[in-house]
């Protein structure tokens, strides 16, 4: 499993560090005493976990667009990182239908720019490109997709991430093999956890409704997703980055998702949230099924994570039940005892992984 001692003093460059998942990643690395540099747009939501954790004051934070090759090159050149983790993206399916050109520009050409900066930075030894479980051509079957399945996402977001995989493979074959740079893509499922305030995501929608005392609107309660706590993929990214740094032959493409018994429908997640929130608050919130006629989204999606388990002996540590408990505890602190939000994040990292 991951050895955070490995990261002590390591120079790590993260794109997308101001986002939800990026903020959790930065918190873990700072706890490990890594030398962390971030490159991203301003935090995408208000409130934002990045600001709640005061990350701007604890690391080198560059505010910039990954489509700006020259500025990102300048920032990476100054940082001289050994490890690069690329997370910056336009991450929402429904938003990609509204703004497909922007989505492709950020997710495809943005990836080209990140890899081009890596190509021009001699210090880099290990690279992780964070994509998504949605890179696969979805056949609506009950089996988990394996890393050798066809890449062909349906919607602009998913498809742009499929393209990002191909771009990474091309750069790897064309430039990085001869430089001995280890490059992996990692395909994680839907993540939940404290500090997510984005639109069109199950837990933020649940929290917003619960605070207002309103019913939670669920668009498609029967859709199955590989939901997992945000710390699961974050720790997996760090594990693979660490191990391929030591042994470049371990670089590849890896799924990251929950065990079979924790693959739940959106309705299951909403029901768990309501039960645990009501138990904590004494309220009686509920969810309702209300399809809003939105664009196509896959109904059934699972990942086969046998490869990462076999190669790295990785395994998910947080059950679905625990995932909801940790998530609600963080939001409860945010609502009722704001000063303890940062401490709660650190506590969840320590209690589950250290």
Model-derived segments and their meaning:
Residues 163, 167-171, 206, 269, ...:
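Hydrophobic alpha-helix immediately C-terminal to the catalytic Tyr-X-X-X-Lys motif of short-chain
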Residues 12, 71, 102, 109, ...:
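Residue-level recognition of oxygen-bearing side chains
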Residues 7, 17-19, 84, 171, ...:
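Generic structural signal for small/hydrophobic residues in well-ordered secondary structure
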Residues 1-188, 298-299, 334, 344-353:
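N-terminal Rossmann-like NAD(P)+-binding domain of SDR-like oxidoreductases, especially those catalyzing
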Residues 193:
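Flexible loop/cap residues within protein kinase catalytic domains
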Residues 31-38, 64, 190, 210-354:
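C-terminal substrate-binding subdomain of Rossmann-fold SDR/epimerase-dehydratase oxidoreductases
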């Amino acid at each position: 499993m991951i050895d955070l001692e490995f990261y002590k003093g390591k120079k790590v460059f993260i794109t997308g560090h101001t986002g939800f998942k990026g903020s959790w990643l930065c918190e873990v690395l700072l706890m490990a005493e890594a030398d962390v540099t971030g490159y991203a747009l301003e935090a995408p939501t208000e409130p934002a976990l990045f600001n709640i954790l005061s990350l701007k004051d604890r690391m080198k934070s560059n505010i910039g667009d990954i489509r700006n090759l020259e500025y990102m090159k300048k920032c990476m050149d100054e940082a001289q990182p050994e490890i690069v983790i690329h997370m910056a993206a336009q991450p929402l399916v429904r938003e990609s239908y509204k703004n497909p050109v922007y989505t492709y520009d950020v997710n495809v050409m943005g990836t080209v720019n990140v890899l081009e900066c890596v190509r021009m930075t001699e210090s880099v030894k290990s690279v992780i490109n964070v994509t998504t479980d949605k890179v696969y051509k979805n056949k609506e079957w009950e089996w988990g997709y394996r890393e050798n399945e066809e890449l062909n996402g349906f919607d602009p977001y998913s498809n742009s991430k499929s393209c990002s995989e191909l771009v990474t493979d091309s750069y790897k074959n064309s430039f990085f093999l001869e430089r001995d740079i280890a490059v992996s893509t990692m395909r994680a499922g839907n993540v939940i956890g404290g500090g997510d305030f984005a639109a069109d995501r199950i837990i933020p929608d649940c929290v917003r409704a619960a605070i207002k005392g309103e019913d939670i609107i669920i668009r498609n309660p029967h859709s199955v997703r590989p939901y997992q706590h945000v710390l699961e993929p974050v720790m997996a990214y760090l594990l693979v980055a660490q191990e391929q740094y030591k042994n470049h032959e371990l670089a590849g493409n890896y799924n990251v998702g929950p065990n079979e018994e924790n693959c739940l429908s959106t309705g299951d997640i909403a029901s768990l949230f309501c039960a645990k929130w009501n138990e904590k608050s004494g309220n009686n919130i509920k969810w309702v099924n209300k399809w809003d006629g939105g664009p196509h989204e896959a109904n059934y999606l699972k990942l086969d994570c046998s490869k990462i388990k076999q190669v790295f002996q990785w395994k998910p540590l947080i059950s679905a039940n625990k995932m909801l408990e940790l998530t609600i505890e963080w939001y409860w602190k945010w609502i009722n005892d704001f000063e303890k939000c940062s401490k709660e994040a650190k506590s969840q990292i320590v209690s589950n992984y250290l």
